[in-house]
Amino acid sequence: MGRDKKNTALLDIARDIGGDEAVEVVKALEKKGEATDEELAELTGVRVNTVRKILYALYDAKLATFRRVRDDETGWYYYYWRIDTKRLPEVIRTRKLQELEKLKQMLQEETSETYYHCGTPGHPKLTFDEAFEYGFQCPICGEILYEYDNSKIIEELKKRIEELEIELGLRSPPKEEKPKKATRRKKSRSGKKKK
């Protein structure tokens, strides 16, 4: 995995973990190499408690490590944090597998149920049983519920599942069909073309 790809993946995971504040903490930690939570808070302007939460989440995700140093004068321990990308490919794979399972569950739900909707964006999509309970009227606006065409959602889910399975090596990429070569008819000895 190249340096830029690694950095982008790390920042994406940081954003998932703690939003823009986590991205700032990771950037500061990468730039500094090793720092305490207080130093990171000062560098980023993020509250110390938030920095600690982010660091612990990165540690739980196996993307940060620390070393503990005891101050002989005060007896206090200081934690020096650093980013650890050795396990980044493993973390990315695990996250993709989790996403794949979630997408498969969503596909199962979309294909096993018939849904009903009033057509108003933001209003709930209801299963047959739920729609029946409401007398096939939207619980928000009271409009009639119609069968919901989820074929586009199903196709998008199948496409993303296939992409993830290919990325994870669980499925071979589809083979591209080669264009067929035009065949020439052979001429017979008499000069006429054979069929």
Swiss-Prot record:
GO terms for molecular function: DNA binding. The lineage of its organism: Archaea, Methanobacteriati, Methanobacteriota, Thermococci, Thermococcales. Transcription factor that plays a role in the activation of archaeal genes transcribed by RNA polymerase. Facilitates transcription initiation by enhancing TATA-box recognition by TATA-box-binding protein (Tbp), and transcription factor B (Tfb) and RNA polymerase recruitment. Not absolutely required for transcription in vitro, but particularly important in cases where Tbp or Tfb function is not optimal. It dynamically alters the nucleic acid-binding properties of RNA polymerases by stabilizing the initiation complex and destabilizing elongation complexes. The keyword DNA repair does not apply. Keywords: DNA-binding, Transcription, Transcription regulation. Gene3D superfamilies: Winged helix-like DNA-binding domain superfamily/Winged helix DNA-binding domain. InterPro entries: TF_E_archaea, TFE, TFIIE/TFIIEa_HTH, TFIIE_asu, TFIIEa/SarR/Rpc3_HTH_dom, WH-like_DNA-bd_sf, WH_DNA-bd_sf. NCBIfam families: PRK06266.1, transcription factor E. Residues 181-195 have a biased composition (Basic residues). Residues 6-89 form the HTH TFE/IIEalpha-type domain. The keyword NAD does not apply. This is Transcription factor E. SMART domains: TFIIE (SM00531). PROSITE patterns: HTH_TFE_IIE. It comes from the Archaea. The winged helix domain is involved in binding to DNA in the preinitiation complex. Residues 172-195 are annotated as: Disordered. GO terms for biological process: regulation of DNA-templated transcription; transcription initiation at RNA polymerase II promoter. Pfam families: TFIIE_alpha. Monomer. Interaction with RNA polymerase subunits RpoF and RpoE is necessary for Tfe stimulatory transcription activity. Able to interact with RNA polymerase in the absence of Tbp or DNA promoter. Interacts both with the preinitiation and elongation complexes. Belongs to the TFE family.
